[in-house]
A protein has these predicted regions:
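Membrane-interfacial loop-to-helix junctions in multi-pass transporters
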Residues: 25-33, 113-119, 158
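Hydrophobic alpha-helical transmembrane bundles of multi-pass membrane proteins
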Residues: 21-22, 115, 146
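Residue-level recognition of pore/gate-forming positions within transmembrane alpha-helices
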Residues: 14-18, 44, 70-74, 125, ...
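Hydrophobic alpha-helical transmembrane segments
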Residues: 8-12, 34-42, 64, 115-122, ...
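Membrane-helix/interface signature in polytopic inner-membrane proteins
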Residues: 127-166
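Juxtamembrane membrane-interface segments at transmembrane alpha-helix termini
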Residues: 19-27, 51, 74-83
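Transmembrane helix-bundle core of multi-pass membrane transporters
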Residues: 62, 66-134, 161
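Single transmembrane alpha-helix segments in multi-pass membrane proteins
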Residues: 1-24, 37, 41, 45-63
Length: 170
């Protein structure tokens, strides 16, 4: 499975997380940040499920569908920041309101923009590395990708693996 649409999944995750941050902008609770992160993850996952569905149901080419969906996600974002999410005090620039501090990741080094997202990214790389190189599921992903006939003969569930790969990439 080739997922060329990771940018679209990232964009839809940002839209879902950003929408949550804007919706909860007046809330002063430590639960806002986890809600924003969770909705961001769900946004990317749901966007990744669309090409998975099209691939498994209609045998659509996942390269084309995921790539085209990246453009759709970009257009949705453009619509939102030029329309309903535009900051009325933003001097007509296409941007949303500033998120509250409760919706922002903590800064790691004062005077920089380095935040906790760096740690999340490094942890994600480690988890995906372990998943792909040290687990049965990672082996199944490789076999389905490199030798679909062998995967079928071994009894690997191709449909399940396509769905999982697109969901994880979201």
């Amino acid at each position: 499975v080739w997922n060329i649409g990771a940018e679209g999944q990232f964009t839809m995750g940002a839209i879902a997380g950003g929408g949550t941050a804007l919706f909860l902008n007046t809330q002063e609770s430590f639960l806002v940040l986890p809600a924003v992160l969770l909705m961001g993850i769900l946004g990317g996952v749901v966007w990744g499920m669309i090409p998975a569905f099209l691939k498994t149901k209609f045998n659509a080419n996942e390269i084309l569908t995921s790539l085209m969906l990246s453009y759709v996600a970009l257009l949705i974002l453009s619509y939102l920041v030029h329309g309903p999410w535009r900051d009325p005090g933003g001097y007509n620039f296409p941007e949303s309101e500033i998120f509250s501090d409760f919706a922002m990741l903590p800064i790691l080094l004062e005077g920089t923009r380095l935040n906790l997202g760096t740690g999340f990214a490094l942890l994600s790389v480690l988890i995906i590395y372990i998943l792909l190189s040290r687990t049965v599921l990672g082996y199944q992903f490789k076999v389905v990708g490199l030798a679909p006939a062998a995967a079928k003969h071994a009894g690997f569930d191709r449909v399940k693996l396509i769905w999982l790969s697109m969901i994880i990439s979201g």
